[in-house]
Amino acid sequence: FQVSQGTVRKAIDELAAENLLIRRQGKGTFVPTHSEPKVRFRFLKLTPDDGHQPVSGSEIIDCQRLRAPAEIAQHLQLKTAATVVRIRRLLSFDGQPTIFDDIWLPGRVFRGVNEDTVRANDSPLYAWFEVEFGVSMVRADEAIRAVAAQAEAVQYLGVPAGRPLLQVDRVS
């Protein structure tokens, strides 16, 4: 490929800095899985001002197979009304409900995903997607906007209706 060793090292350093590669002293450099603590929340970087690393928790609310709404079909590059899987979960940090998560998956790729399999899974979802379905999430495009808390946020996050929240739309 006619690339200098220094250029390759610099590229590896940059990939390691972004947690796309992991270095293990005495063993080498590896592509991490989503089950490794350092990359478990690769696309979610929430750290309190004091730097404390909170204990995380995940509660599955439900999992359904549905026809893709137009907006979801467009994001996932599917035909309108294609089958999708929607997983709803609540993420907590130090016992505090923090994130109400809607995860949309192409139904054809994730055929074995249903409420029973999601609830039976005890590994991080992205790690499960890698191991069980051969789908690695290595990149994400995000759009963030301010929204007023609606009924589901009020119910699951325990915030007053209308409270300003951040909504993150991520395609990974």
For every predicted segment, state its role.
Residues 99-100:
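Short glycine-/small-residue motifs
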Residues 105-107:
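A short acidic/small-residue loop/turn micro-motif
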Residues 80-94, 165-172:
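A short beta-strand signature
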